[in-house]
Amino acid sequence: MPRKGPAPKRPLVLDPVYGSPLVTQLINKVLVDGKKSTAERIVYGALEGARAKSGGDPVAALKKAMENVKPSLEVRSRRVGGATYQVPVEVKPGRSTALALRWLVGYSKARREKTMTERLQNEILDASNGLGAAVKRREDTHKMAESNKAFAHYRW
């Protein structure tokens, strides 16, 4: 453990088009091999496509999708004696946002549309409507926490 405490959070540089920290985080999550301009093109294309399909504000659609994907509970492994228990714990806000972005981008990559822009756009729209693989992942996570509720007294 460091003696000076945890490292301070660095401020996010907001994206130039929407000025939203959430869009900036999404761009950074899509980023591969340091190609930021490519990641920006993918994300902005997906958001513009979402605007065209839904007819609303794309950042609002992204926020709605994030609310539908963010987990509130997860399970953590805890070793007690010789047994390992899956202990349900609450998820901190920063981690829930990070998990939601990771799931959105990860399940976008697994989709079958032709370009990453289309995949991300459709996953965002599906998630904002309560559908899609990322929302299913959140439901599975909550179900796992619910089924292991008996071990909640082991949480730390």
Curated annotation (Swiss-Prot):
GO cellular component assignments: small ribosomal subunit
Disulfide bonds: none
InterPro entries the record matches: Ribosomal_uS7, Ribosomal_uS7_bac/org-type, Ribosomal_uS7_CS, Ribosomal_uS7_dom, Ribosomal_uS7_dom_sf
Entry-linked Pfam families: Ribosomal_S7
One example of a Gene Ontology biological process annotation: translation
Entries under SUPFAM superfamilies matching the protein: Ribosomal protein S7 (SSF47973)
The UniProt record lists the keyword Transport: no
Keyword list, A-Z: Ribonucleoprotein, Ribosomal protein, RNA-binding, rRNA-binding, tRNA-binding
Ribosomal protein in keyword set: yes
GO molecular function annotation: rRNA binding; structural constituent of ribosome; tRNA binding
Superkingdom of origin: Bacteria
Biological role: One of the primary rRNA binding proteins, it binds directly to 16S rRNA where it nucleates assembly of the head domain of the 30S subunit. Is located at the subunit interface close to the decoding center, probably blocks exit of the E-site tRNA.
UniProt record similarity statement: Belongs to the universal ribosomal protein uS7 family.
UniProt subunit comment: Part of the 30S ribosomal subunit. Contacts proteins S9 and S11.
Protein name, entry field: Small ribosomal subunit protein uS7
Organism: Arthrobacter sp. (strain FB24)
Phylogenetic classification of the source organism: Bacteria, Bacillati, Actinomycetota, Actinomycetes, Micrococcales
